[in-house]
Amino acid sequence: MESIEEFEKRLGYRFQNKNLLIEALTHKSYKKPYNNERLEFLGDAVLDLVIGEFLFLKFPKADEGELSKMRASLVNEKGFAKLAERVSLGRHIFISNAEENNKGREKPSLLSNAFEATMGAIYLETGLSVVREVVHRLLDEVYPKIDLGSLFRDYKTALQELTQAKFGETPEYVILGSSGPDHKKEFEVAVCVLGSEYARACGSSKKEAQQEAARIALEIFHRKEKEAKESALKGKSE
């Protein structure tokens, strides 16, 4: 197994407090008095800011809506897992034997959480400037030809992957109606999961409306996940 020093070298940052790094790499399954959940919570907020800043500087002509969509395509489990893979983070996480046997080192969720926690740990030790340097460098390495088009996600596919993983079900899209003249029609679509409406949106085509509804639904799912994490952490501290 590679040393922590090798990981730090790839990361481009050497921790003064190694215990902080070890905590960031420790999954809750490892059964220690500590795990990386609190650092993950902090890192999530830090990454939201520095990735937003990266896009703001990279695309001076992009409007707020475009920047928000691009950030949503990077600030998520899949995006963070890609950055984690870039520094071979999976080799260094501390997990239980059960997780090891279940290929836990390759799971996007574990990689994403540990990456968030590691960024939270760097922030605690040195502040925002070093996190910014590390993350901006990794983004340039992972997305060398980043542009507006390449960052817009297929939200329908992303939502389907999420709902199949969580519920074993695929989303259903319902056309609620259309308005406007034939040359400038607008369609309204609702996306339903397990029979319940999660979001609705409008677009100049059915496909565009479905993509926007899927994007909103993804935001709702991610917000609920974040709120659940915050609630769980609050419960543990009380």
Swiss-Prot record:
Its cofactor is Mg(2+). Keywords: Cytoplasm, Endonuclease, Hydrolase, Magnesium, Metal-binding, mRNA processing, Nuclease, RNA-binding, rRNA processing, rRNA-binding, tRNA processing. It is found in: Cytoplasm. One of its GO terms (cellular component) is cytoplasm. It catalyses: Endonucleolytic cleavage to 5'-phosphomonoester. GO terms for biological process: mRNA processing; regulation of gene expression; rRNA processing; tRNA processing. Its main location: cytoplasm. The active site is at residues 44, 116. SUPFAM superfamilies: dsRNA-binding domain-like, RNase III domain-like. The keyword tRNA processing applies. Its EC number is 3.1.26.3. One of its GO terms (molecular function) is rRNA binding. Homodimer. Belongs to the ribonuclease III family. Digests double-stranded RNA. Involved in the processing of primary rRNA transcript to yield the immediate precursors to the large and small rRNAs (23S and 16S). Processes some mRNAs, and tRNAs when they are encoded in the rRNA operon. Processes pre-crRNA and tracrRNA of type II CRISPR loci if present in the organism. This is Ribonuclease 3. It comes from Wolinella succinogenes (strain ATCC 29543 / DSM 1740 / CCUG 13145 / JCM 31913 / LMG 7466 / NCTC 11488 / FDC 602W) (Vibrio succinogenes).
